[in-house]
Amino acid sequence: MRRKIIAALLAFSLTAAAPAPPRRIVSLNTCADQYVLALADPGQIAALSPYGHDPELSAAVAKARRFPVLKRPAEEVLALRPDLVIGFPDGAGGVVGAPDGRWRKLGLASADSFAAIRAQIGQVAAIVGHPARGEALIAGMERDLAALPRPKRGGVAAYYQRRGYMTGTGTLVDELMRRAGLTNLAAKLGKPALAQVPLEQMIAARPDYLIVEEGSEAIVDQGTEMLHHPVLRSIPRIRVPQSWTVCGGPAYVQAARSIIAQADAAPKR
């Protein structure tokens, strides 16, 4: 009997010590938006980031449109009186763009791997009060990744962006390439995580694939015009929405599936 009483008291003390789930969550960047939308109850979400309704940046824009977005974050956060603010870490235990307040803060760095995405899902799920929901999301993503078809073709790919910027190693895009059986051209050229590669150097390198953002297919300025050079146009393209790769999150599986399918279906050179 004594043991039961002690166990009951211990359980009560742990429950009492745990903070109540937040009732007013504010997200300060698009990356945090994805986690909040996937893991929090709708009634818990007070506001999303300024770009929460931007289809080029938000992978969950259809769901996000139900919620207000911030226009002047510093002012509006104070007015909203949230009990949890999520965004990029500021290096001092706070969140970038969050004014001082008594609310809890969770800083999430940019996820550069599926392992980081899993960890962040766990963090967000725990702090919003739905750890089981986070576990289910992780399990579902792992199951979907395990079910992806084995890549049929390898090759060298370059994630080439407007103004000649190429995404390098140690990034989310680099891991997605490797998952699709592709070698990142940046690794072969010894480039860092982000480097500007002149058009002439890209033409000389002749990768087997160019991975481009869907939004860059239209020529809107000189930065996008270079992606339409005749030699580059002859290289098979893998088109991926920027919203799938700008942040780590639940869209990781969609990005991996799409890259594998497009690489396998591309014409041989």
What name fits each language-model region?
Residues 12-22:
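Bacterial Sec-dependent signal peptides at the C-terminal "C-region" and cleavage site
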Residues 23-24, 115-126, 135, 213-269:
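Structured C-terminal subdomain patch of bacterial secreted/periplasmic proteins
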Residues 24-80, 84-94, 182-185:
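A short, structured surface patch at a secondary-structure boundary
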Residues 24-36, 132-180:
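Basic- and aromatic-lined ligand-binding clefts that recognize polyanionic substrates
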Residues 29, 89-90, 162, 189, ...:
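Short secondary-structure boundary segments
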Residues 49, 55, 172-194, 236-239:
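His/Asp/Glu-enriched short active-site or ligand-binding loop at hydrolase and phosphoryl-transfer sites
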Residues 93-96, 109-123, 156-175:
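Extracytoplasmic ligand-binding site segments that recognize negatively charged/polar headgroups
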